[in-house]
Every structure is written in C-alpha cells, then in structure tokens.
Amino acid sequence: MLLKNSQTLILFSFIIIASSIFGLALRYIQIDSKISMTVIWILLFLAVIIKVEKVYLEDFDDSKIQQYLTSVFALEIIVFVKNIMICLNLALFFLLTSPLIFLILSLNFKYFLQINILASLSLLSLVFISSITASISNSKSNRLAITSVVTLPLFIPILIFSIGSLDMSLGDKNSYLFFFAYFLLNLAFSPLLTSFALKKLSM
C-alpha cells in the first residue's frame, strides 16, 4: 500500500512540475483559465493511465488472476472495488496537491471546490476506461496489446465537457450531470470488458 501511495505521489509531483514549467513559460502572457484547465486535465489523464497500468500489472498477474477466479467474489466485483480504490487514492492526492497547482497556474480559488468535484467525477470514468486499456495492454499477446488504443477516444468526451463546463456556472449542479451519467455508462460495460480481457487475454 505504501509503495502504491508513493507511486501516486510521484505522478502528482510530475503534474506539479509540468504545471510549473507551463506557468513559467507563459508567465508574461495572460492565460485563459480554459487553457490552464486543459493542461491540468491532460496531465491528469496521463497520471490516471500510468497509475491504472501499474496497478493492473502488479495486482492482476497470472497467479493472482487464478486466485481471483477461485474466489467467492466474481472477477467483475473485484475489478469494480479495485477501480473505486484507485479513484479514491487519486482524488485524495488531487485534493492535497490542487492548492499548489492553483497557485502555479493562477487559477481563481473560488472554483477550488467545484473543480475538485469535477476532477473526482472525471476520475471515476477515467479509471474505469483505463482499466480496459490496462487489461488489454498487459495481455501476453503483443498483437492484442496494440488494440488497447481503441479505448482512447472514450477519454475525449471527458476533456471536452470538462472545459465546456467552464462556460457554465460551476455552481450549477446541472454542469456535473454529464460526468455522472458518463460514469454510469462506463460502469455498465467496463467491469465486464475488463474481467473478460483479464480472463481470456492473460492466459
């Protein structure tokens, strides 16, 4: 657990460093908040993909998958719980590091709570989509691993609506409905596809 938390800390240190480089490079230019938000979300996407990839590589090797298959719990349930734990871990670290990111990118702190809620809702979908990517890319077949890129377009709606939500009032609850609905959509098929890939492609 300590090792996994240290991995998350390293990922968010990367986000802070990358944000600092972006902020320093454009310190004499008036930056629109949408640009700063885009930078944060792209870095968050990268952090999620790397984090989920490492967790699935370590926690779903051949021997552990065999143990999970003989467990009283369905593999889909195990995948769901694992993904929720990853979400909570990432959301907590984002909450802790976001004040520094806000300062670096000169974002308005009046949106601090709303953006953290937005990030948490985004993380739910990002992690569940990334679990499909990770389960395929960790397969023994390099040919099948290449097909994991087909899940990448699923990330695009989150980026579009995250930036688009700035045009709406972040205090308006309706601006978060898409993220909740998109998570429910991913929840319907992600654990099934992930568990299928783990069972079939890793053997």
Where are these regions (language model features)?
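Hydrophobic alpha-helical transmembrane segments in multi-pass integral membrane proteins
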Residues: 155-169
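Junction motif at the cytosolic side of a transmembrane helix
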Residues: 186-203
